[in-house]
């Protein structure tokens, strides 16, 4: 296995997304491709709490072809396309409870030459400092939809423990009523790869 450690067990993801999101900070996100392996330490996440969360795709238990995977077991990969960018989420909680955590930013680790080739002409800080940027840099695509985050080619291992974690409102959800103010965005305080 090309990553630096074993994938975290499925039990790690079997908790509400607001508990999982801060725990993912510092973990190592690994993507294996034919070109090689790219990895980055997760430094920013957002929790989406499902049926009661107006900002969640699954608000009101809305079940569509796109959101179907959110209703499956924890640890499934939920990718979707927004403004031509693929965004990556990890399903949390349990079967029938459609919660997920969006991976918003990562600090490049392994395979930086791959990231540079996938994000040419960009400063290294710009490779992975946003949810669409990090998927492009790491080679994460819609082909990863529905896979398990506990096994290659896309998985998460232990990384580092952040010294400080900050919280605040999620980004880009202005039309979601009171949910836009929930402090469900988490980031490693002071990390230069955080999106904003």
Curated annotation (Swiss-Prot):
E.C. numbers: 3.2.2.-
Gene3D superfamilies: Methylpurine-DNA glycosylase (MPG)
One MF annotation (Gene Ontology) recorded for this entry: DNA binding
InterPro entries (alphabetical): Formyl_transferase-like_C_sf, MPG, MPG_sf
Any Pfam family the entry gives: Pur_DNA_glyco
Highest taxon, organism lineage: Bacteria
Keywords: DNA damage, DNA repair, Hydrolase
GO biological process: base-excision repair
Enzyme class: hydrolase
NCBIfam families per record: 3mg, PRK00802.1-2
Family to which the UniProt record says this protein belongs: Belongs to the DNA glycosylase MPG family.
Stated name of the protein: Putative 3-methyladenine DNA glycosylase
């Amino acid at each position: 296995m090309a990553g630096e450690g074993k994938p975290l067990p499925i039990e790690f993801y079997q908790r509400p997304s607001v508990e999982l999101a801060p725990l993912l900070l510092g973990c190592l996100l690994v993507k294996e491709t034919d070109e090689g392996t790219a990895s980055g330490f997760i430094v920013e996440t957002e929790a989406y709490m499902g049926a009661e969360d107006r900002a969640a795709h699954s608000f009101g238990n809305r079940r569509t072809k796109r959101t179907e995977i959110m209703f499956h077991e924890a640890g499934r990969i939920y990718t979707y396309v927004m403004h031509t960018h693929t965004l990556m989420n990890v399903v949390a909680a349990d079967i029938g409870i459609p919660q997920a955590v969006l991976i918003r930013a990562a600090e490049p680790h392994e395979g930086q030459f791959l990231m540079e080739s996938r994000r040419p002409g960009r400063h290294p800080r710009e490779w992975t400092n946003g949810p669409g940027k990090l998927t492009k840099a790491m080679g994460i695509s819609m082909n990863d939809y529905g896979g398990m985050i506990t096994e290659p080619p896309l998985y998460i291992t232990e990384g580092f423990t952040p010294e400080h974690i900050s919280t605040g409102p999620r980004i880009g959800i202005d039309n979601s009523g009171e949910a836009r103010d929930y402090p469900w965005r988490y980031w490693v305080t002071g990390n230069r790869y955080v999106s904003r």
